[in-house]
């Protein structure tokens, strides 16, 4: 019964969040969860290890590319700000150079849903991105190098990703 009540509360809180970019896009409360276990649970891309290693680990196992699709995993390169890289699941492609992602630990101890990421690379190849920063309510000023996108096998809709997010949090917390 307690589990059902908790799930109802999570779904109710998620429903309260509008389409805007604000704290309403936080999923649940504080969670001690890294990006990789969460992305693995949400996307089905069964890779292990630090996020920056996912690109090489995916070779020969998953399709890799430079065009986003919902359900794929955006892999950030290691950088001064991201010493282990970062991974985020694409929840929607809104424009050719703008996507929404659902991710863990971009904001420490938080899962954020439908956060904007824009391609600022000179070659329009998603090799350099800027990410929405929820605490400020706007796009972050940092520029982050990225490898590209890993596809799990089939695309997912934004609604499917939103519905799967609370369960992915629970799965990732057990890993």
How should these model regions be labeled?
Residues 23-89, 94:
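Secreted/periplasmic proteins that engage bacterial cell-wall peptidoglycan
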Residues 17-20:
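Bacterial signal peptide processing site
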Residues 97-175:
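Aromatic- and glycine-rich peptidoglycan recognition patches
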Residues 12-15:
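C-terminal motif of bacterial Sec signal peptides marking the signal peptidase cleavage site
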Residues 6-7, 44-45, 139:
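Alpha-helical interaction segments
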Residues 1-9:
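Sec-dependent signal peptide recognition
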């Amino acid at each position: 019964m307690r589990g059902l009540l908790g799930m109802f509360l999570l779904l109710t809180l998620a429903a309260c969040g509008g389409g805007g970019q604000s704290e309403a896009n936080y999923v649940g409360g504080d969670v001690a969860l890294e990006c990789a276990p969460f992305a693995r649970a949400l996307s089905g891309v069964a890779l292990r290890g630090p996020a920056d290693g996912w690109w090489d680990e995916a070779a020969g196992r998953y399709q890799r590319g430079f065009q986003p699709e919902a359900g794929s995993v955006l892999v950030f390169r290691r950088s001064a700000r991201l010493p282990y890289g970062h991974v985020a699941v694409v929840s929607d492609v809104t424009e050719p150079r703008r996507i929404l992602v659902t991710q863990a630990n971009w904001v420490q101890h938080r899962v954020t849903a439908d956060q904007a990421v824009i391609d600022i690379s000179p070659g329009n190849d998603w090799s350099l991105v800027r990410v929405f920063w929820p605490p400020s309510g706007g796009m972050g000023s940092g520029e982050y190098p990225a490898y590209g996108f890993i596809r799990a096998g089939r695309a997912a809709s934004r609604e499917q990703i939103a519905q799967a997010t609370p369960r992915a949090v629970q799965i990732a917390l057990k890993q």
